[in-house]
Every structure is written in C-alpha cells, then in structure tokens.
Amino acid sequence: IIMIQNHNENNPDNRLKLTVLVGKKISAEKFNHLSALAKGDLNITIIQTDRPKQEAFRMDKSGEAKFLRQSTDDLALVGYFELAKELAHIPNLRAVFIPTSSGTTAQALGEEFQKLKLPIQIHIVQTTACHPIASSFPLTENAVGLKTASPNDKTSIAGAIVDKIAHRKEKVLAAIMASHGGAWIADNEEIRTAMKITHENADDLKISTNSALAVAGLIKAVKNGWQWDGPVACLITGK
C-alpha cells in the first residue's frame, strides 16, 4: 500500500490502482491496520473475500489486474537484498534467524550474503501448524518439535506463517545448506516464552507472535548446542 502511495505521489500523471484481497479470517488488528493505511485513498481498495487467492487468480486471468505474488515473483527478492546489505554492517555477524512463510526473505538474504561472500548462517523458523520448508531440511530438529507439540498447536498463534505450498522451498533449503544454517519449528508455548524473554531483556520491547518465532528459533538452536563466535540477529517483522 505504501509503495503504491509513494508511486502515485511521485507520478501524478501515471497513477496506479491497487486492490488488496484479504481473507475473512484475518485478525481484526491486521484488517484495521490495512484499512487505516488506505483510508481516504481512492486508488486503493481493500476487499474481504472467502477465497482471496482464487479471486486474485481470476482477476489476473480476466485482465482486470496483475496478481502481485511474493511467493513466486522474483522481483519480491530485490527489496530484501538491501536488508542483507544493512545486516552486513553488523560487525562479525554470524547468523540470522528468520520467521518464514513463503521463504522470500530467507532466500533473498541467503543469496545476497553469498554474493557478498559473507559467512552468515541462514536459520528459518516455522510453526507446528505450517512447516513445509523446515520439515524438509535434513538436519533440523523438527521431528522432536512435532512429537512434543500439543494438539492445540495445529493452529499457531503466529498467524502470518501460512504458505503450505512453499514454491521457494528448494532455493531456501539451498541457501540454508550453503550457509551452514538450520531450520526450526516452534510451538505456541515456545513462541510465548520467546515473547516474554524479549520483553524482560530488551527494554520492555513487545514483539508480535510472528516476530517471536525468530527468538524461539534461536532459543531452540542454543538448547541444541549451536554456538557462534560473533553476534546473531533475529528479524523482528511486522504484525
């Protein structure tokens, strides 16, 4: 939404229209945040529908709109290349833990770190409810995580991890392997613990359940014997 608004502000003679399709199960907090961003902008429409992805495919096929799909469009990687360069400014950075749904962030950071010839590990963290990439990684501790997960964890409190198709899976796995990183699966209790630890040890910082995945992954890695001789970063993302 912000990118479209910036484009339209800078290109008044070539304005773009954006339709945002969201599911009926979206949290009220997320929907209200999107609505606030788009409020009063006649070029942006937010529509709630039972099947947003199918509706987007239909609109693309009929020529009504172009479906901007982060999980398959490699243009989505470009913005994260800049994030990789920012992270590279951290002296002696050794690893990055990334809450992962489609894998776009992990793929982009991994590829850019390789280009920059930086020995920074990529660690992805997924949930007990959605883990198509982590469960495919041969060295992950995911089997233990799944066996000890409570039945309630079939639905994760980290609701942004939803991509069960994982079109980027092979490239993400390649990035993890090339960086000598890892893949982790966190249950709801581990996510809540990560939120509590962060709040208590980072100047009362309150992070979302989705952001807490990164911290939960780091905690699991440390418990499983991982060690580093430099700093480790956890990506704190949006809501």
Annotate each language-model stretch with its function.
Residues M3-V22, F31-I46:
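Transmitter module of two-component histidine kinases
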Residues D60-L116, R192-N201:
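Active-site/ligand-binding-proximal alpha/beta "capping" segment
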Residues I1-M3, R15-V22, R94-T105, P231-I236:
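A short, small-residue-rich loop immediately preceding and capping a beta-strand
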Residues L18-K25, I122-Q126:
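Short internal beta-strands
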Residues I1-D13, E111-L116, A216-W226:
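Alpha-helix C-terminal capping segments
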Residues I1-M3, A28-F31, L77-V78, P99-L109, ...:
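Short glycine/serine/threonine-rich phosphate/pyrophosphate-binding segments
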Residues E141-A158, A175, A212-K239:
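Phosphate-binding loop/pocket of nucleotide- and phosphate-handling active sites
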Residues F31-K39, I46-E64, K115-T209:
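Active-site/ligand-binding loops adjacent to catalytic centers
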